Amino acid sequence: RAALKSGGIVYMTFTPESGMTEVVTQFMTKLGQSQALYHATWDDAIHLDEDVKAEILAALPPHERAMRSKGIPVLGSGLVFPLDENDLKVEPFAIPEYWPRLCGIDFGWDHPTAAVWIAWDRDTDTVYVYDCYRKSAETPVVHSAAIRERGEWVPVVWPHDGSQHDKGSGKPLAEIYRKQGVNMAHKHFENPTGGISIEPGIMDMLQRMQTGRFKVFNYLGLWFEELRMYHRKDGKIVKAHDDLMSATRYASQSLQFASLDRPKKRPRKAISDYNHYEHHEGAYA
């Protein structure tokens, strides 16, 4: 506790040993206008050389290493995806036109509406997450505009709650997005084997990550923020701060709907009646 009579700055440092407590969650997801959060890692401790870091890390239990070295909270009964996030990261690159693309969306209001865009390298069966979007307390009109900006032609897969009727218009939520020009799939998401349970998709994503067939552009900070908080408690996935993860699951489990279709480029029209042959007739005689 501190009283800032002089209007100064208070620094608070801590290691999140108790996991995602209310205080940690508040700083990681709901910062006030006068607050800021900086993840200080061992890389900021210039007095620690690489040999010392390796020695300390080796002495720590595996589940504490990310928490001690990177300030990432120990979460519940464990991370849903217990991997080094650096193994998922790739430098952004121009996506080949022959890779199909797809978007997954998770609807929200008090919690964010989230969308994730993926590209599929069919030669190696590798999924690449190349963009994401997350926003709370906005209308479908706002979300639709953000989705269209990233390619109106990209198909969008959506969960079963998109069939529910919007309280304002009385229309199904998915239909509202469709009317706004979003290329919504014709029906709600289902796993490739049927049903809408979470675990089959989670296991497939984990296997892809473990075998190097799931990659994420390294600048997608919001996506990695959720990855670090996506955890289980008593064996069950905690349904909080999981919007981008859900959208990713919908997309990665719907590769059969990924599309190559793009707007065809129209031939450019002549901008004048100037006839090159007529004015250079002598050159062709």
What are these regions (language model features)?
Residues 49, 77-78, 90-93, 111-115, ...:
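Short acidic/glycine-rich loop or secondary-structure boundary segments that cap or lie
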Residues 27-33, 86, 92-94, 175-180, ...:
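Short, conserved catalytic or adaptor-binding loops enriched in Gly and charged residues
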Residues 102, 107, 162, 243-244:
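Generic detector of well-ordered alpha-helical packing
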Residues 243-255:
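Stable alpha-helical structural segments in soluble proteins, enriched in small hydrophobic residues
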Residues 113-119, 249:
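Short beta-strand scaffold segments in enzyme catalytic cores
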Residues 45-107:
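ATPase catalytic-site recognition across NTP-hydrolyzing enzymes
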Residues 1-60:
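ASCE P-loop NTPase helicase motor core
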Residues 116, 123-239, 258-285:
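Mg2+-dependent endonuclease catalytic cores in nucleic-acid-processing enzymes, primarily RNase H-like
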